[in-house]
């Protein structure tokens, strides 16, 4: 059986933590930031942990991640 392929789009957008959770960048920061509140910009600065249903889908895209 051939090796499974990792989806390139997923490996560029998501990182796995040491405990197996999926980390992703916050959404909604590409354009239109002038109308966003300062609080939104500040809280969307870092990354976030995906919810369990979303993480399950992303993990299926990256079969060889930790």
From Swiss-Prot:
List the Gene3D superfamilies hit by this protein, alphabetically: 4.10.410.60
Pfam families, sorted? Ribosomal_L35p
Per UniProt, which keywords does this protein have? Ribonucleoprotein, Ribosomal protein
Supply one GO BP term.
Answer: translation
Q: Where is this region: Disordered?
A: 1-32
Keyword hit for Transcription = no
Mind telling me which PROSITE patterns this protein's record contains? RIBOSOMAL_L35
Composition-biased stretches (Basic residues) = 1-15
Q: Please provide, in alphabetical order, the Gene Ontology terms of the cellular component aspect for this entry.
A: cytosolic large ribosomal subunit
Please provide, alphabetically and separated by semicolons, the GO molecular function terms listed in this UniProt record.
structural constituent of ribosome
- What NCBIfam families is this protein classified in? rpmI_bact
**Protein family according to the UniProt entry:** Belongs to the bacterial ribosomal protein bL35 family.
- Note the HAMAP family from the entry: Ribosomal_bL35
Write the protein's name: Large ribosomal subunit protein bL35
